[in-house]
Protein backbone atom coordinates (compact mmCIF):
# COMPACT_ATOMS: atom_id res chain seq x y z
CA UNK A 1 0.00 0.00 0.00
CA UNK A 2 2.82 2.54 0.57
CA UNK A 3 3.74 2.25 -3.13
CA UNK A 4 0.18 2.92 -4.20
CA UNK A 5 0.01 5.94 -1.89
CA UNK A 6 3.27 7.26 -3.33
CA UNK A 7 1.98 6.75 -6.88
CA UNK A 8 -0.95 9.05 -6.13
CA UNK A 9 1.24 12.05 -5.28
CA UNK A 10 0.81 15.19 -7.32
CA UNK A 11 2.88 15.08 -10.46
CA UNK A 12 2.94 11.28 -10.75
CA UNK A 13 1.11 9.09 -13.26
CA UNK A 14 -0.97 6.24 -11.85
CA UNK A 15 -3.53 4.32 -13.88
CA UNK A 16 -5.43 1.09 -13.40
CA UNK A 17 -7.09 -1.19 -15.93
CA UNK A 18 -10.50 -2.59 -15.03
CA UNK A 19 -12.25 -5.52 -16.71
CA UNK A 20 -15.58 -6.92 -15.54
CA UNK A 21 -15.43 -4.73 -12.45
CA UNK A 22 -12.02 -6.04 -11.35
CA UNK A 23 -8.64 -4.34 -11.37
CA UNK A 24 -6.47 -6.30 -13.82
CA UNK A 25 -3.51 -3.97 -14.16
CA UNK A 26 -1.69 -0.97 -12.75
CA UNK A 27 1.00 1.33 -14.10
CA UNK A 28 2.91 3.94 -12.12
CA UNK A 29 5.20 6.47 -13.71
CA UNK A 30 7.16 9.10 -11.86
CA UNK A 31 9.32 12.07 -12.70
CA UNK A 32 13.05 11.84 -12.19
CA UNK A 33 15.79 14.32 -12.96
CA UNK A 34 13.30 17.08 -12.11
CA UNK A 35 10.68 15.44 -14.37
CA UNK A 36 11.29 17.73 -17.28
CA UNK A 37 12.74 15.36 -19.89
CA UNK A 38 12.87 11.84 -18.43
CA UNK A 39 10.31 9.79 -16.53
CA UNK A 40 10.61 6.39 -14.94
CA UNK A 41 8.02 3.75 -15.65
CA UNK A 42 8.27 2.50 -12.07
CA UNK A 43 5.76 -0.35 -11.98
CA UNK A 44 3.65 -2.27 -14.44
CA UNK A 45 1.64 -5.02 -12.82
CA UNK A 46 -0.82 -7.21 -14.73
CA UNK A 47 -3.11 -9.86 -13.25
CA UNK A 48 -1.41 -13.20 -13.95
CA UNK A 49 -4.75 -14.78 -14.89
CA UNK A 50 -4.85 -12.46 -17.92
CA UNK A 51 -1.44 -12.85 -19.54
CA UNK A 52 -1.05 -11.63 -23.10
CA UNK A 53 -4.52 -10.03 -23.08
CA UNK A 54 -3.17 -6.58 -24.00
CA UNK A 55 -3.54 -5.03 -20.53
CA UNK A 56 0.17 -4.22 -20.18
CA UNK A 57 0.33 -2.86 -23.71
CA UNK A 58 -2.72 -0.64 -23.19
CA UNK A 59 -1.42 0.78 -19.91
CA UNK A 60 2.03 1.40 -21.39
CA UNK A 61 0.64 3.09 -24.50
CA UNK A 62 -1.57 5.30 -22.32
CA UNK A 63 1.45 6.36 -20.24
CA UNK A 64 3.52 7.02 -23.37
CA UNK A 65 0.75 9.18 -24.87
CA UNK A 66 0.46 11.13 -21.61
CA UNK A 67 4.23 11.70 -21.63
CA UNK A 68 4.20 12.81 -25.28
CA UNK A 69 1.52 15.40 -24.51
CA UNK A 70 3.91 16.86 -21.92
CA UNK A 71 6.95 16.83 -24.25
CA UNK A 72 8.79 14.26 -22.15
CA UNK A 73 11.69 12.91 -24.20
CA UNK A 74 12.64 9.66 -22.44
CA UNK A 75 10.91 6.89 -20.56
CA UNK A 76 13.15 4.45 -18.75
CA UNK A 77 12.54 1.40 -16.57
CA UNK A 78 14.28 -1.39 -14.73
CA UNK A 79 13.41 -5.03 -15.25
CA UNK A 80 14.89 -7.88 -13.26
CA UNK A 81 16.27 -11.30 -13.99
CA UNK A 82 14.69 -13.17 -11.10
CA UNK A 83 12.98 -15.74 -13.34
CA UNK A 84 15.71 -16.37 -15.94
CA UNK A 85 14.32 -13.90 -18.46
CA UNK A 86 17.47 -13.61 -20.59
CA UNK A 87 20.57 -15.46 -21.72
CA UNK A 88 22.59 -13.56 -19.10
CA UNK A 89 21.17 -15.44 -16.11
CA UNK A 90 24.18 -16.74 -14.20
CA UNK A 91 26.74 -14.83 -16.27
CA UNK A 92 29.66 -13.16 -14.52
CA UNK A 93 29.19 -9.63 -15.82
CA UNK A 94 32.08 -8.31 -13.74
CA UNK A 95 34.78 -10.29 -15.57
CA UNK A 96 33.86 -9.25 -19.13
CA UNK A 97 30.57 -7.34 -19.34
CA UNK A 98 30.64 -6.28 -22.98
CA UNK A 99 30.75 -9.69 -24.67
CA UNK A 100 27.65 -11.13 -22.97
CA UNK A 101 25.81 -7.80 -23.11
CA UNK A 102 26.34 -7.61 -26.88
CA UNK A 103 24.60 -10.95 -27.36
CA UNK A 104 21.77 -10.72 -24.80
CA UNK A 105 18.73 -12.74 -25.83
CA UNK A 106 15.38 -12.68 -24.04
CA UNK A 107 13.47 -15.80 -23.13
CA UNK A 108 10.10 -15.94 -24.91
CA UNK A 109 7.23 -14.21 -23.07
CA UNK A 110 9.57 -12.64 -20.51
CA UNK A 111 9.24 -9.06 -19.28
CA UNK A 112 12.47 -8.25 -21.15
CA UNK A 113 10.92 -9.53 -24.40
CA UNK A 114 7.70 -7.62 -23.71
CA UNK A 115 9.59 -4.35 -23.31
CA UNK A 116 11.52 -4.99 -26.52
CA UNK A 117 8.22 -5.51 -28.37
CA UNK A 118 7.02 -2.20 -26.94
CA UNK A 119 10.04 -0.46 -28.47
CA UNK A 120 12.22 -0.20 -25.38
CA UNK A 121 15.95 -0.67 -25.87
CA UNK A 122 18.44 -2.33 -23.58
CA UNK A 123 20.66 0.51 -22.32
CA UNK A 124 22.37 -0.75 -19.18
CA UNK A 125 22.81 -3.40 -16.53
CA UNK A 126 23.48 -3.67 -12.81
CA UNK A 127 25.35 -6.96 -12.28
CA UNK A 128 24.33 -9.08 -9.26
CA UNK A 129 21.53 -6.63 -8.33
CA UNK A 130 19.21 -9.49 -7.37
CA UNK A 131 21.85 -11.99 -6.19
CA UNK A 132 24.98 -13.57 -7.67
CA UNK A 133 24.51 -13.87 -11.43
CA UNK A 134 21.09 -12.20 -11.32
CA UNK A 135 21.31 -8.76 -12.96
CA UNK A 136 18.84 -5.91 -13.25
CA UNK A 137 18.39 -4.32 -16.68
CA UNK A 138 17.89 -0.70 -17.59
CA UNK A 139 15.70 -0.21 -20.64
CA UNK A 140 14.52 2.99 -22.26
CA UNK A 141 12.55 4.51 -25.07
CA UNK A 142 12.77 7.92 -26.70
CA UNK A 143 9.60 9.81 -27.42
CA UNK A 144 11.51 12.57 -29.21
CA UNK A 145 11.07 13.23 -32.87
CA UNK A 146 14.23 14.70 -34.28
CA UNK A 147 14.05 17.48 -36.90
Regions found by a protein language model. Give the residues of each.
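Conserved acetyl-CoA-binding loop-helix of GNAT-fold acetyltransferases
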Residues: 46, 52-65, 76, 91
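C-terminal "cap" of GNAT-fold acetyltransferases
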Residues: 97-147
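Short coil/loop residues immediately preceding or within conserved phosphate-binding loops
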Residues: 11-12, 24, 36, 41, ...
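Conserved GNAT acetyl-CoA-binding A-motif
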Residues: 67-107
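Alpha-helical elements of Rossmann-like donor-binding domains used by nucleotide-donor carbohydrate transfer enzymes
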Residues: 2-3, 58, 62, 110, ...
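Conserved beta-strand in the GNAT
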Residues: 16, 22-31, 40, 45
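Conserved acetyl-CoA binding element of GNAT-fold acetyltransferases
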Residues: 37-48, 76-80
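Active-site rim helix/loop that mediates acceptor-substrate recognition in acyltransferases
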Residues: 1-19, 28
Amino acid sequence: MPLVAESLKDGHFSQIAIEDGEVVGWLWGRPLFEGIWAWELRWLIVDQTRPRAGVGRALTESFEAWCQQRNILTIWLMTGEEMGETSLRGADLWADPFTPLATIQPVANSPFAFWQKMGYRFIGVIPDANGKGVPEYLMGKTLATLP
